[in-house]
Every structure is written in structure tokens, then in C-alpha cells.
Amino acid sequence: MEDLPILYSFRRCPYAMRARLALFISNTKCELREVSLKAKPEQLIKLSKKGTVPVLHLEPKKIIDESLDIMVWALKNHDPGNWLPKDTITMEDTLSLINNCDSEFKHNLDRYKYGPRFNVEDTTIHRGICETFIKDLNNRLHDHTYLMGDTASLADYAIVPFIRQFANTDGEWFYNTPYPLAHKWLDKLLASDLFLSIMTKYDPWHEGQTPIYFHAEC
């Protein structure tokens, strides 16, 4: 097969999930290299100083190592689901919502889910801050089926991996919160063929193995 982009990924990482979602829906053929976070391959570390996933290696001296940038790059090449907003106002709203997810929500999600790692004794404080974001999503869903309209778009797929992580931290608590529209939105996206397709389990990549090709037609 011709030289293809190489995606360094980790199945359960929400940043890597959002990258895989966009690459898959755009039918961007690439080689998938599953990474063990406990034994990151030397090739990944050489490519990106951050040493974190996802990293998309496009050519010898070109990489994309920010998940949202990978999404936008893939969708600008091919966007059959019309994920990218067509007007400036909706795009600005989309990016603002994603930024809220990636900044305040993710900061507090980490301290809720991994309290001891951050020396947090009362994780419910951080859960409560995260809850305000869930409330915002629920309010948006009063007006339409998805966050930006009646079809799923960039905002939904960039954010849903993080809401999945939040919900899985304490599912009983999450599904007893008064945000039924957010619950329904999450469940619908997680049960979709698209999401299930990007969650296939693979062993960690090692040098010399048979390549795994990741795209919508495989």
C-alpha cells in the first residue's frame, strides 16, 4: 500500500478518540499505531516533544499533534457528514464550546476522576464544577437534537469522548442528575456505528509488525 499518514493513538484517550472519529468519517486512510502509555515507542517521542497521543505523522517533517487540529485537517479534506460549520458565527460558537470542554471541564474532570494523582481529597468539588458544563449541554439540547443543530457536528464529536469519561467515573450518579437530554445525547452517540467502529481493541504497536490500516472501508 502507498505511504499513508500514521496515527499514534491510545484507544481510551478522549483526545485520540476525537481524532479517530474525524479520520474515520472523512475516510482518511492511515496506519494506526496503538500506543502503550507505559512504554511509548521511540518513534512517537522523536516526532513530538509532548510525547502524548494523538499524533498524526503526515510526511517526514510534518506532524499534527493537537487532536482538534487533526479533526479540522481531516474534515477540510473530506467532510461527508457536514461536521464543519458553514458560517462564521456557528464556527465561533463551536470552537468556544470545545475550548470550554478542553480547559475548565477537562481540568476539573481530571481532578474528579484521578483525585489522588492531584492530591485532591474532596473530588465532589470538581465534579460539581463539571456538572455546570453538563447543564449547559443539556440546555442547548432543549432546542435541537445535537449541540449545534439537528445533525451531529464537530462540537458533538469533539466533546462526547470527554463526557463519556466523566459519566464512566460514577455512572449511577451521572444518570441520576437532572439532565435527561444530555444523557440521551451521550447514549445515542456512544451507540452509533461510527463510535463503535473507532473503539476496536488492538495490541500495542511494535516495530516490524504487520501494519493496521484504519479507515471507513476496512
PLM feature spans:
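GST-like domain detector, emphasizing the conserved glutathione-binding G-site
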Residues: 1-131, 138, 143-145
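A structural signal for the main folded, soluble domain(s) of proteins
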Residues: 22, 192-195
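Short, flexible loop/turn segments with low-complexity composition
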Residues: 84-90, 196-206
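Extended, well-ordered alpha-helical scaffold segments
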Residues: 125-129, 177-191
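Alpha-helical transmembrane segments in multipass membrane proteins, preferentially the mid-helix core
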Residues: 136-137, 167
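Surface-exposed helix-capping loop/turn segments at secondary-structure junctions
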Residues: 139-150, 194-199
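GST superfamily/GST-like fold recognition
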Residues: 147-172, 178
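Acidic/histidine-enriched, glycine/proline-rich intrinsically disordered or flexible terminal extensions
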Residues: 202-218
